C-alpha cells in the first residue's frame, strides 16, 4: 500500500530532524485523506473536460472575494456580483449555463439547494480558506450526487488536516471599507491517531453599489480518527450573513441617461426607497437586508477493505434559517390579507409596508461509493439519498397610515407553504485499459426525484381572489448514461471523446413563477465532447470541441422575481456548441503565461416569446401576445470568453497580471430586440456590452512565515456590467393596437479598487 501524500501547507517550525521522524511515523496513519471522494471526480484518463485548481492557486487569489470570482480564469466562466465587489451575493455561469444548473458538491456531498438548485455563496463566506482543491467539470461530466449537472459541475475537497500543530492569521483591507480576517489553528497528530483543525472568519464591505453592505461570519472545524486502514472524520462549517439588498440592479435610464448633460449614476440602488423628505432628498429603509444562517455537518468514513477495494460513506445534515426584510411602496392591502379600510374615512386601499419573508429548512442524507482498482480496471459503485423539508412564510411587520382592521398586529402572517423533496441516485462507472494506450469509460446513473409543494405562495392570484395556491407533486425517474474513450499516443499527446446524457427536473421557481396555464417540463441534454491534449516540459496546449443539444431547455428569459432571482422558460429545441482552447508556456525561467479562449454559438431554434398584454386599467388579458423570432441567441451566453495570466517570480517576489474578456450578452432570448423606454427615448438593445478587465496581484514572502499581498482589481478602470434583467409587456390602446413597454436594469461592477493582505504563519 502506498501511503505517500501531502498533508497540509502550514507546518509548525520544529527542527527538521524531529519533523522528519515524526512524519515517517505518522504518514502511515493519515494517508487516507488523499483518496477520499475520488468516485465523483475525473482523473487523467477520464474522457471528460475538466480543470483542477490546487491549494496554491486558490490561495494566490483568495483575499476575500467569493468562490465565483476565484474561478474567473477557468475556461468558459463568467462571474457577477450584485454589490459590484465580488463579495456578498455573487454568481457565475459556465458555457452560458446559469448557476442552478451547475452541480456543486463538498467532499462528494450535495451543496445545491434542493428547491432552487442554486448555491448561495453569501452563506459560505471565506470557504475557499478551508479548501484543499477543487475540480471544475464542463459539460455533463461524471455522475455525481445531488442536483443534475446540466452544463458543468464543481467538486470541492476540504482541507487536509496538517501533520503538525500550526496557527495562521490572514487579513485583508481595501476599497469600499472591505475587510477580511481569518484565524486558523490545528492540533497536528495526537497520539498517532487523532487530529483537529479549525477556522474563524469575518468579512465586511460597504459595497461599490450604494448601501450594498455585507457583514459575513463563518467557521470551519474538523476532527479525525485514523489508522492504517480507516479514517473517520467529522466536519462542520457554518456561515451567517447580513446583506443590504442590491438585487434590483441600476435602471437603464439612470445608468445610460439620454440627456448628455446628465451624469450616469453607476452606484444607484433603488432598494428600500421610502420617498423624499421635505427638502426633496430620497430616504431609504435602513434595514432592507437579507439575513440568513446555514450550518453543515458531515460524518465520513473511509475504509480500506483490501489493497484493491475501498469504501467511502458519509452522513450529512444541513440546517438553514433566515429571512429578508424590505420596505414596499403602494402595496395593495388585499394581497396581504388585510382589511383595506372599507367604511373607514379616508378609504385605504394601498399603503407602504414592511414585510419579512422567511425560509426555514432542513436537508440531510447519505452518500457512498465502493471503489475497486486493479491492474487495468477502475470501477466505482456509488450513490446516495437525501431528503429536504423547507418552510416558506411571510409576515407583515408594519403598515403605514393603516386605517383598516384594528386587530392587525405586527408580524401578521400572510402566506405559508412547505416544500418536501427526496432525491435518490445510484451509479456504476468504470475505466478500463484495453491496451497500453487506449482506455474506455462507461458511466450509468439512475436518479429518482419526488417533489411536493403545498400551501400558499407569496403572490396574489387576482383570478382566484387570494394568495396563489400551490399543490404541486411531480415525480421524475431519470436514466443518465455516459461513455467515452481516451487514447494516449505518447507521453506528450492524447485524444479523448465522449457522449453523455443528463436530465434535470424543474426547480421551485420554475413552477411558482410559470405563466398562466404553463407547466414547466424536465430538461434533457445530450453532450458531445472531443478533446486533444499536448504536454511537454515548457509548454502545454489543449483543445476541446463540444456540442450540447437540449430538449426543453429552461433558459433564462431575462426576467427576475421579487427577490432578484432569474426566471426561465422551456424552449423545445436549442443547443450550445463551441471550442475551448487552453495554453501555457514557460517563456524564460521565472516568467510563465497561461491563457484560455472559448468561442461558441448558443442558439434557440424557432423561438416564440409570449408577452403579457394589459388593458387600459392595468388588468392582464387572458391571452398573451405571441412574438416569433426564429433562431435566436440564448440569453447570457457570450460568443467569446478569453483569459490571460502572466506570472513572474523572482526569489520571494511574485507578480501576476491577468486579463478577462467577455463578449456581448443578451438579456433575453429575442436576439437583441431594441426598446423605447418611457423614461429614455433612445432605442437600446437588450444586451450587456462586451468588457475587458485587467487585474494586477503582487506578493512578497518574508521567509516561510510572513507574506504580504496587494491586489489591484480593474487596473484600467473599465466601466462595465456583468448581469442584468429585462421586463416587457404590451398595453392595449383605445383603437385596439398594442403599445410595447420595457424596463431594464443592469449590475455595474466596481472601477479600479485595491485590496491589501498580510498572512502570518506560526
Where are the predicted features?
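Gram-negative outer-membrane beta-barrel transporters
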Residues: 436, 547-549, 569-671, 759
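Face-selective signature of the C-terminal outer-membrane beta-barrel domain
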Residues: 292-460, 486-488, 498, 535, ...
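Transmembrane beta-barrel wall of Gram-negative outer-membrane proteins
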Residues: 166, 173-204, 209-246, 297-308, ...
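Extracytoplasmic beta-strand/coil segments of soluble accessory domains associated
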Residues: 68-110, 132
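Short acidic/polar hinge/loop motifs at secondary-structure boundaries
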Residues: 110-138, 157, 254
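C-terminal beta-signal and adjacent terminal beta-strands/loops
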Residues: 593, 661-675, 700-762
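Short, acidic, small-residue-rich periplasmic hinge/interaction motif at the N-terminus
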Residues: 20-60, 99, 540, 544
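Membrane-embedded beta-barrel scaffold of Gram-negative outer-membrane proteins
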Residues: 310-316, 486-488, 494-500, 521-577, ...
Amino acid at each position: 500500500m502506498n501511503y505517500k501524500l501531502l498533508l497540509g501547507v502550514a507546518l509548525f517550525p520544529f527542527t527538521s530532524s524531529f519533523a522528519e521522524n515524526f512524519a515517517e511515523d505518522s504518514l502511515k496513519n493519515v494517508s487516507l485523506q488523499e483518496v477520499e471522494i475520488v468516485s465523483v471526480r475525473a482523473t487523467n484518463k477520464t474522457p471528460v473536460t475538466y480543470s483542477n485548481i490546487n491549494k496554491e492557486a486558490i490561495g494566490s487569489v483568495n483575499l476575500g472575494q467569493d468562490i465565483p470570482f476565484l474561478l474567473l480564469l477557468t475556461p468558459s466562466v463568467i462571474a457577477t456580483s450584485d454589490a459590484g465587489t465580488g463579495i456578498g451575493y455573487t454568481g457565475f455561469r459556465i458555457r452560458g449555463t446559469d448557476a442552478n444548473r451547475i452541480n456543486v458538491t463538498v467532499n462528494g456531498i450535495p451543496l445545491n439547494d434542493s428547491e432552487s438548485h442554486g448555491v448561495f455563496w453569501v452563506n459560505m463566506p471565506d470557504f475557499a480558506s478551508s479548501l484543499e482543491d477543487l475540480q471544475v467539470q464542463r459539460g455533463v461530466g461524471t455522475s455525481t450526487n445531488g442536483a443534475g449537472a446540466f452544463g458543468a459541475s464543481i467538486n470541492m475537497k476540504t482541507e487536509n488536516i496538517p501533520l503538525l500543530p500550526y496557527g495562521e492569521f490572514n487579513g485583508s483591507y481595501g476599497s469600499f471599507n472591505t475587510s477580511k480576517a481569518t484565524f486558523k489553528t490545528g492540533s497536528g497528530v495526537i497520539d498517532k491517531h487523532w487530529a483537529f483543525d479549525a477556522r474563524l472568519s469575518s468579512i465586511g464591505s460597504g459595497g461599490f453599489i450604494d448601501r450594498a453592505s455585507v457583514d459575513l461570519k463563518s467557521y470551519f472545524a474538523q476532527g479525525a480518527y485514523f489508522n492504517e486502514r480507516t479514517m473517520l472524520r467529522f466536519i462542520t462549517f457554518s456561515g451567517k450573513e447580513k446583506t443590504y439588498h442590491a438585487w434590483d440592479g441600476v435602471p437603464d435610464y439612470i445608468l445610460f441617461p439620454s440627456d448628455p448633460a446628465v451624469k450616469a449614476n453607476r452606484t444607484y440602488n433603488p432598494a428600500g426607497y421610502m420617498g423624499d423628505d421635505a427638502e426633496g432628498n430620497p430616504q431609504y429603509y435602513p434595514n432592507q437586508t437579507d439575513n440568513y444562517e446555514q450550518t453543515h455537518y458531515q460524518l465520513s468514513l473511509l475504509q480500506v477493505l483490501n489493497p484493491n477495494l475501498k469504501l467511502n460513506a458519509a452522513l450529512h445534515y444541513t440546517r438553514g434559517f433566515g429571512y429578508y426584510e424590505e420596505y414596499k411602496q403602494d402595496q395593495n392591502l388585499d394581497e396581504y390579507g388585510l382589511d383595506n379600510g372599507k367604511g373607514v374615512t379616508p378609504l385605504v386601499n394601498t399603503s407602504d409596508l414592511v414585510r419579512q419573508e422567511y425560509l426555514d429548512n432542513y436537508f440531510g442524507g447519505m452518500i457512498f461509493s465502493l471503489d475497486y482498482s486493479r491492474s487495468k480496471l477502475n470501477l466505482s459503485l456509488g450513490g446516495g439519498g437525501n431528503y429536504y423539508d423547507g418552510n416558506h412564510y411571510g409576515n407583515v411587520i408594519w403598515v403605514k397610515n393603516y386605517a383598516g382592521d384594528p386587530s392587525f398586529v405586527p408580524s401578521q402572517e400572510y402566506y405559508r407553504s412547505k416544500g418536501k423533496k427526496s432525491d435518490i441516485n445510484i451509479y456504476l462507472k468504470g475505466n478500463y485499459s484495453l491496451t497500453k494506450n487506449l482506455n474506455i469509460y462507461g458511466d450509468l446513473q439512475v436518479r429518482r426525484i419526488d417533489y411536493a409543494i403545498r400551501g400558499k405562495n407569496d403572490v396574489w392570484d387576482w383570478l382566484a381572489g387570494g394568495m396563489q395556491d400551490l399543490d404541486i407533486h411531480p415525480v421524475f425517474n431519470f436514466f443518465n448514461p455516459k461513455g467515452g474513450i481516451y487514447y494516449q499516443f505518447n507521453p506528450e499527446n492524447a485524444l479523448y471523446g465522449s457522449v453523455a446524457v443528463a436530465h434535470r427536473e424543474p426547480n421551485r421557481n420554475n413552477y411558482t413563477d410559470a405563466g398562466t396555464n404553463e407547466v414547466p417540463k424536465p430538461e434533457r441534454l445530450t453532450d458531445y465532447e472531443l478533446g486533444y491534449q499536448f504536454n511537454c516540459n515548457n509548454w502545454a496546449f489543449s483543445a476541446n470541441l463540444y456540442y450540447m443539444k437540449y430538449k426543453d431547455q429552461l433558459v433564462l428569459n431575462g426576467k427576475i422575481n421579487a427577490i432578484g432571482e432569474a426566471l426561465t422558460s422551456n424552449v423545445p429545441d436549442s443547443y450550445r456548441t463551441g471550442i475551448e482552447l487552453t495554453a501555457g508556456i514557460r517563456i524564460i525561467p521565472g516568467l510563465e503565461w497561461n491563457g484560455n479562449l472559448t468561442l461558441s454559438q448558443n442558439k434557440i431554434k424557432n423561438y416564440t416569446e409570449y408577452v403579457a398584454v394589459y388593458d387600459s386599467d392595468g388588468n392582464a388579458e387572458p391571452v398573451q401576445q405571441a412574438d416569433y423570432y426564429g433562431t435566436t441567441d440564448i440569453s447570457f451566453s457570450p460568443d467569446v470568453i478569453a483569459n490571460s495570466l502572466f506570472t513572474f517570480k523572482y526569489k520571494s517576489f511574485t507578480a501576476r497580471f491577468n486579463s478577462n474578456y467577455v463578449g456581448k450578452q443578451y438579456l433575453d432570448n429575442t436576439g437583441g430586440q431594441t426598446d423605447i423606454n418611457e423614461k429614455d427615448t433612445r432605442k437600446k438593445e437588450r444586451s450587456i456590452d462586451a468588457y475587458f478587465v485587467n487585474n494586477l496581484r503582487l506578493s512578497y514572502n518574508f521567509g516561510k512565515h510572513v507574506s504580504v499581498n496587494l491586489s489591484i482589481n480593474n487596473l484600467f478602470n473599465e466601466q462595465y456590467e456583468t448581469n442584468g434583467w429585462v421586463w416587457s409587456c404590451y398595453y392595449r390602446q383605445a383603437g385596439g393596437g398594442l403599445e410595447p413597454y420595457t424596463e431594464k436594469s443592469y449590475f455595474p461592477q466596481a472601477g479600479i479598487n485595491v485590496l491589501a493582505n498580510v498572512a502570518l504563519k506560526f
